[in-house]
Amino acid sequence: MVSSVAQLLADSLEAHSIDQVFCVPGESYIGLTSALVEREKVRIIVCRHEAGAAFMATADGRLQNRAGVVLVSRGPGLANGLVAIHSAYHDATPLVVIIGQVERADFGRLALQEQNYSLLLADITKSVIEVNQTEMVSEAIARAFHIAESSTQGPVAVVIPEDLFDEETHAPVIMPAPKLSSSPRQEDLDKLAEMISRAERPLILVGGALLAESLDNADVLSDLNTLAENWVLPISPTHRRPQLFDSKHPNYGGYMGIRVPSSLLDHMKKTDLMVVLGERMTDTVSQSYKFPSAPTPQFFMAHIWPDADEIGRVWHPNLGIPASPHNVIKGLLRKSIPKDAVKRKNWVEVLNKKHNKLLSKKWDPASDGVNFAAVVCEVDKYLEKDATITSDAGNFGSFIHRYIAVSYTHLRAHETREDLVCRLLVE
């Protein structure tokens, strides 16, 4: 069957379950937007600035547990979206950036807004795929999604010349690659179980990769709940991922992100084992590389992340497991519950008590105006249970983390993302 490259590209996006794309419409990819308009399953969200479009695509990816898609036109369009792409790279968030390039006949001639995207994006994307042949378009899209959503997730750019969109092609739609899920070695699982069993004051940090290789978020969150309750463990969601554990659950051990209050952090520092489950570990989470100390932690540390290259890059853990965090949780749940797990009950209760005290709607008056805590608490009165909050990356975000409780209402086997009470913080 003959179709235009633009139509093939639109079909390829549909094949990857994309239901919306974000953009500031530009002539460099106008063929694609024309093809998308003809499709009922994909909405075009028109934005006022590429920075907003790229952040929206990033948020869409986080909420739907797949790569979001942003369309940008040539050099300036991409430059406007760089902050969001940089954020997605640092946050290990999957994102596909489709860039409309100058026509092929004008390559290398300093055509209007021409840019070398491989050089520009080298430090903030996982890959830059340049397409110059009609037969490669759908394959390039499939590869982009696979790279963006695999291992350490992140942004991938696909560069397509303007004149290519209108050309005809016989190439088929390339379907998504199977989603892979890495499993831990049995000896690593045994060692982790032993480390947790021996620990009297463990702290479990959970991050975005907890969901990265999962087909069902509800199963992951349910299993995490079960592990926390059965093994008597405190769970601390990390920066930008507060929705991973109910902040009103008795095993909630406090949020680990921007400006953790000393009343909580000082008690956390008494831990004798930190299990980092699906968190890449950054300066924000580690409180400026001091908790744990880099490169040598001051307590036992286990790091679970689906990419072996990331483990040991900054911290040298006692145990590193390059595997799906959910598969690690499932492996632990298949083991017998430690007989003396109850010894950690007081440790969990004290952490939770300190966390709950921070949730109380109390703040000091500001001599020079309104304490931002008062603003956040007032906003919280009107939030729906499934509200999504967007925040900038400044320290003021700590007020949101502290005063707005995060929870999920259901944990059914086939729960959709709308059933989750989800809070999203987009930098």
Regions found by a protein language model. Name each.
Residues 27-29, 50-52, 73-78, 99-105, ...:
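Acidic, glycine-rich active-site loops and adjacent beta-strand->loop/helix elements
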Residues 135, 172, 194, 298-395:
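Phosphate/pyrophosphate-binding active-site segments
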Residues 410-427:
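Single conserved hydrophobic/aromatic residue that forms the stacking wall/gate
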Residues 233-253:
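Short connector loops at secondary-structure junctions
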Residues 4-79, 83, 90:
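N-terminal cofactor/phosphate-binding cores enriched in small/glycine residues
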Residues 6-9, 14-16, 24-27, 32-37, ...:
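Active-site diphosphate/adenylate-binding microenvironment
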Residues 19-20, 58, 62-72, 76-99, ...:
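Structural signature of the thiamine diphosphate
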Residues 23, 99, 233-239, 302-305:
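Short internal beta-strands
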